[in-house]
């Protein structure tokens, strides 16, 4: 490709409405342009990257034995009513009627459509297992689209759905998809983690997210320093302290704390170690518990994990924090003065709290705290559970190393759905015993457009994007200096250009009448991994300047060796 025949569309300035670096660089590098809120046109450079990501995904899905199909973006509302998600999904589901007043939706996902297809096409266990995938446009009417294509309304997604007659069969496909996803992101040279995750609104059993590590990520992910353990912070287990509870050294005593309504204020005013404080959070209880509220206790410097807490039998789902009015009506004190001593409602304490001694907590009297609280002596040890978020330095749940926490961008998610959709849509096959059997499902998604943005978040510098070779818009940029004045420079540039193209290398020959500084800046901005500079002075010594975008160092390569050098260094 020649720049004279290409739409480069680079920008010198960063658009004011671009928040994260990937959005800024995708606009400046001429990859995308905004059409409306959450809607983007992909320009040639962006589309080249998008297609590379798409092709890697397709190749690995094919290698894993998945079968490609294409399903409509527009879906009949009847299917969503039948599955029960018509009322569950909310305003993100764009609903409309056609000229015949028939209701439809723009598909945010395709569980209903694929299950409808299978219930009409597959009739016997002998035809299973099967795994179908598509790379298709999705639409979710996000209330606040942001971060460019990271959270847009229209996006390209690879979604796959597998069908089985047993959990064992599902597990085999699930493991194959896990391996395929790992291969996909490894081929793109991304630093990622596969983490245990919550199944969320889609439902089901086992679930893993594939997270690209990036400071701008919206998710906190946890992983071990010495093993492959990794999990979303919502699911990471906080292991009980190895050391047992220390002996009590203090007597229980009541302290006036009129100006200490938070842990931070208590610690500041009384110069307490925050590790010796406990905060008490009240949430709604289930009807079966016989109480209106449940108390959840975590150490002062720890955070309650709401997903873990919601799994406690007495805690109502969804987890709902009590209002100050409800707290006062039940306890007789405000939220800043709560604690376990003489508390008349069910109490659940975190594992770390259960191992504490001589700690401080509210006295259930406004403006007062107990200091020197000890379990069993001052209050019976209640139910103990893991209800907090892990913190850096915690012991890894697998016993190997300690935990680190980093931000991640979710680019893939795999689920074991079970029979949620097949039951709702009555998708059955004749089993080996001749009886109808409800199918078991898995679903597996990759946000193809989001992968592009995530790759930029992880691969950039002050000059622009640094693409991994596998997904770069071009492998090589050829920058001939003054080629319109030097026949020799032009001849060498054209010869190398044709040789590389003949070898299947994607080359961008910058044949514009531009200053060298502009040419260099544009190639660095769009992130071409390999650049060669051809000039008369170097040709006098039969050399060409080579520069790797990531490494940054310049090398002088003999003119007659440059093609072989590039072929040896390009990762395809």
Swiss-Prot record:
GO molecular function: aminoacyl-tRNA deacylase activity; ATP binding; proline-tRNA ligase activity
InterPro entries membership: aa-tRNA-synt_IIb, aa-tRNA-synth_II, aa-tRNA-synth_II/BPL/LPL, Anticodon-bd, Anticodon-bd_dom_sf, Pro-tRNA-ligase_IIa, Pro-tRNA-synth_IIa_bac-type, Pro-tRNA-Synthase_IIa_type1
A biological process from GO: prolyl-tRNA aminoacylation
Pfam families per the UniProt record, alphabetical: HGTP_anticodon, tRNA-synt_2b, tRNA_edit
Gene3D superfamilies reported for this sequence: Anticodon-binding domain (3.40.50.800), Bira Bifunctional Protein, Domain 2 (3.30.930.10), YbaK/aminoacyl-tRNA synthetase-associated domain (3.90.960.10)
GO cellular component, as recorded: cytosol
Record localization: Cytoplasm
Catalytic activity, EC: 6.1.1.15
Keyword line: Aminoacyl-tRNA synthetase, ATP-binding, Cytoplasm, Ligase, Nucleotide-binding, Protein biosynthesis
Quaternary assembly: Homodimer.
Similarity comment: family membership: Belongs to the class-II aminoacyl-tRNA synthetase family. ProS type 1 subfamily.
Function, in words: Catalyzes the attachment of proline to tRNA(Pro) in a two-step reaction: proline is first activated by ATP to form Pro-AMP and then transferred to the acceptor end of tRNA(Pro). As ProRS can inadvertently accommodate and process non-cognate amino acids such as alanine and cysteine, to avoid such errors it has two additional distinct editing activities against alanine. One activity is designated as 'pretransfer' editing and involves the tRNA(Pro)-independent hydrolysis of activated Ala-AMP.
Name under which the protein is recorded: Proline--tRNA ligase
Species of provenance: Pectobacterium carotovorum subsp. carotovorum (strain PC1)
Gene: proS
């Amino acid at each position: 490709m020649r720049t004279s025949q290409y739409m480069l569309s680079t920008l010198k300035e960063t658009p004011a409405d671009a928040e994260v670096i990937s959005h800024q660089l995708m606009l400046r590098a001429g990859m995308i342009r905004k059409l409306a809120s959450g809607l983007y046109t992909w320009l040639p450079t962006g589309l080249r990257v998008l297609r590379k990501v798409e092709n890697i995904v397709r190749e690995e899905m094919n290698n894993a034995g998945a079968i490609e199909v294409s399903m409509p973006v527009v879906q009949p509302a009847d299917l969503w009513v039948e599955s029960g998600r018509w009322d569950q999904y909310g305003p993100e589901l764009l609903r409309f009627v056609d000229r015949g007043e028939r209701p439809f939706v723009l598909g945010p996902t395709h569980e209903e459509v694929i299950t409808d297809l299978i219930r009409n096409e597959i009739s016997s266990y002998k035809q299973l297992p099967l795994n179908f995938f598509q790379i298709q446009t999705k639409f979710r009417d996000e209330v606040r689209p942001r971060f460019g294509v990271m959270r847009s309304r229209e996006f390209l997604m690879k979604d796959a759905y597998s069908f089985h007659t047993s959990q064992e069969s599902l597990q085999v496909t699930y493991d194959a998809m896990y391996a395929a996803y790992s291969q996909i992101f490894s081929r793109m040279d991304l630093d990622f983690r596969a983490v245990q995750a919550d199944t969320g609104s889609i439902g089901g059993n086992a679930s893993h997210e594939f997270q690209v590590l990036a400071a701008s990520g919206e998710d906190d992910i946890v992983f071990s320093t010495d093993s492959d353990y990794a999990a979303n912070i919502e699911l990471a287990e906080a292991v009980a302290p190895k050391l047992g509870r220390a002996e009590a050294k203090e007597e229980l005593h009541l302290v006036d704390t009129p100006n200490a309504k938070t842990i931070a204020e208590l610690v500041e005013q009384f110069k307490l170690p925050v590790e010796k404080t406990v905060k008490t959070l009240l949430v709604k209880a289930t009807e079966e518990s016989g109480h209106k509220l449940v108390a959840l206790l975590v150490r002062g410097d720890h955070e309650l994990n709401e997903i873990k807490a919601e799994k406690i039998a007495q805690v109502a789902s969804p987890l709902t924090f009590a209002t100050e009015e409800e707290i006062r009506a039940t306890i007789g004190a405000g939220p800043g003065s709560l604690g376990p001593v003489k508390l008349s409602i069910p109490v659940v304490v975190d594992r770390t709290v259960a191992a504490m001694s001589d700690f401080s907590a509210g006295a259930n009297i406004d403006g007062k705290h107990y200091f020197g609280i000890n379990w069993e002596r001052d209050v019976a040890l209640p139910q103990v559970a893991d209800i907090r978020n892990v913190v850096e330095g915690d012991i890894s749940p697998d016993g190997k190393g300690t935990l680190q926490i980093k931000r991640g961008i979710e680019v893939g998610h795999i689920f074991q759905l079970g029979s949620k959709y097949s039951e709702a849509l009555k998708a059955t096959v004749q089993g080996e015993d001749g009886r109808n059997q409800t199918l078991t499902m898995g679903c597996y998604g990759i946000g193809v457009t989001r992968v592009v943005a995530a790759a930029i978040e992880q691969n950039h510098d002050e000059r622009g994007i640094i693409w991994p070779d596998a997904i770069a818009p071009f492998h090589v940029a050829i920058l001939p200096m003054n080629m319109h004045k030097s026949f020799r420079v032009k001849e060498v540039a054209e010869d190398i250009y044709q040789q590389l193209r003949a070898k299947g290398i994607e080359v961008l020959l910058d044949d514009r009448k531009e200053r060298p500084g502009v040419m260099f800046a544009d190639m660095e901005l769009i992130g071409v991994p390999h650049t060669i500079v051809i000039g008369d002075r170097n040709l006098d010594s039969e050399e060409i300047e080579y520069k790797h975008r990531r490494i940054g160092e310049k090398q002088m390569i003999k003119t007659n060796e440059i093609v072989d050098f590039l072929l040896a260094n390009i990762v395809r």
